[in-house]
Amino acid sequence: QSAFFTQQAIAVPAFPSKQQDVDPQWKLMSDWIRDHTAEDAIIISHPWKLANFTWMTERATIAKLKLFPQTKEAIVEYYERLNDLSGGAVAKIYFGNEKLHQRKTVKAISAGFSNLNTAQVQELMTMYQSNYFLTDDSHHLDLPIVHTQAAYILYGRAYKEKN
């Protein structure tokens, strides 16, 4: 038992790590977000991926599929937020004629998020009072890049000059 305790004590500085299913590059990106954004920053992030976003970055996000609310009002808002993040895919799924399947739902929400264009992202940033949009390197937007870390890109809000 003492060997196990020693091993655990040595691992504390590296926590969280792959043992907690945390990709080292994601840990670096989340550390950067925590160290370089305001504590009250709202960061738009993928609703399915990076379920540990809030825990790792100590920043707010819009909605995560795994973090389901418990009150009627909050549940309605949750689905509205997922619909916003998926470019309208949630409404199509839940009000369509097809039977609901978890895999199909997750796939549609993920695809919807990954297909958001620059104008849609800017609209989300305005709607949710966010200055940041976190995505992966396959999601190209015409927005300023604030920071990159391996496959992760943090975009910033594009401000227009007032005349």
Locations of regions flagged by a protein language model:
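Short periplasmic/luminal acceptor-recognition loop of GT-C membrane glycosyltransferases, typified by
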Residues: Q7, Q20-K104, L124-H139
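Transmembrane alpha-helical segments
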Residues: Q1-D21
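Short glycine/proline- and acidic residue-enriched helix-loop micro-motifs
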Residues: V12-P16, R103-A108
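Aromatic/acidic, Gly/Pro-rich catalytic loop(s) in extracytoplasmic/lumenal soluble domains
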Residues: K107, A111-N163
